[in-house]
């Protein structure tokens, strides 16, 4: 049995490592208990500065992109379902028979889905995503971030199978989409969380933003495939037109699942939940492009475990029981002001949807028709292309501007373009010039959303919470995002039919509220560790 020797951290904290661990930078036997610990994450500013400038981030960036691929299936569903439900073969397969009587008293039989059926098929996905995010994302604490994503991919494939085997029964198709949504909902929590915990310290914000980039890429690819299928398979009996997007879902899930094999597990999960410190050291070193023997690795582990070491002396049975009771609702009752952090996270997620972005993707088709672009498939490709290309810039600006600044700057620009859109649409005459203005404003709105609110929302929310409550807190925030997504997609057509472009003023009011809310309550989390964020909520 190897002897234990203390290692003196620069802050005065002593961690107990084995002598062979200090020599080799790795080991298997640690005398560390990691139960009921409080989180003390890395000091991003200080530690990132200490990492060698020679550290190569090519492999870490590639591995982060692999993690972010988990968002592709989310975008793929968004990009394919709208076009699928409009395909003639889809309507013939799942619709009910309608008898049409023309002027010459000839009866024509067609099959068509009702608006209610289409609404249920599309919106059930949003509801089930919210349910999956809220109820099953905790699995990431039980079997790891990677294991949780693999579980979600299996659920996703089961949902695809149900849809393919629905045999023309729209309610079975809806059930399949519900199961698929549960799987996707889990990924919307675990993928940003995994990215936040595994990204190189120097570029964490940018790497978390790649999740939104991959989502928009999935939307674009789905739109392009729909366009190809609609052009190539016009015969109502050619079910391959709507089945191909579903079959490809298997391929994406397999690619994502196999790629994750090469990604190390989250160092926070390994060290603080699984109690596997050697693997945590390896993970941190690999994802920051430094050797496992680098002093930064030891310092990072020390920072993760410091609070646990300080709490070991009070680790008796009665206090264990009190901690268990406390931890049940710690995400609300914990300090410092975790309830306020949860409210901030929920509001940011809600405001992302209330910005009106999905209104543009829904109503943009009508605007493009005004200048002769009447094909909804082409319109979708144009809008999703702007969204994807702009998100690439967002990866840079989220890190450059800072998270709160990005939120304020983005919402201010979105407010301007939403007001312009609503005013021109409401009071402008229907001319080619006004339609061109509306198209330009639409693209500008999507551009500013893609470089600010789109990526920064998940980055900021993922950094608000300590590790001990991050899973449940992010699950609740993501659930709110999905519920507002569902409500807006459900209510927008009805509201537009009543007040038309004036709906833009409602979204503008929400954006103004976001600016005020962000200015007063949202903290700047860029390059701040948990202790620094704690001081913001409880100033000493």
Curated annotation (Swiss-Prot):
A biological process term (GO) from this entry: carbohydrate transport
SUPFAM superfamilies the UniProt entry points to: MFS general substrate transporter
Pfam families: Sugar_tr
PROSITE patterns referenced in this protein's UniProt entry, alphabetically: MFS (PS50850), SUGAR_TRANSPORT_2 (PS00217)
Extracellular topology ranges: 77-119, 168-177, 226-243, 375-380, 427-440, 500
TM region positions: 57-76, 120-140, 147-167, 178-198, 205-225, 244-264, 358-374, 381-398, 406-426, 441-461, 479-499, 501-521
Alphabetized InterPro entries for the sequence: MFS_dom (IPR020846), MFS_sugar_transport-like (IPR005828), MFS_Sugar_Transporters (IPR050360), MFS_trans_sf (IPR036259), Sugar/inositol_transpt (IPR003663), Sugar_transporter_CS (IPR005829)
Keyword Nucleotidyltransferase included in the entry's annotation: no
Function summary: Probable glucose transporter.
Assigned protein family: Belongs to the major facilitator superfamily. Sugar transporter (TC 2.A.1.1) family.
Official protein name in the record: Hexose transporter HXT14
Organism: Saccharomyces cerevisiae (strain ATCC 204508 / S288c)
Name of the gene encoding the protein in the UniProt record: HXT14
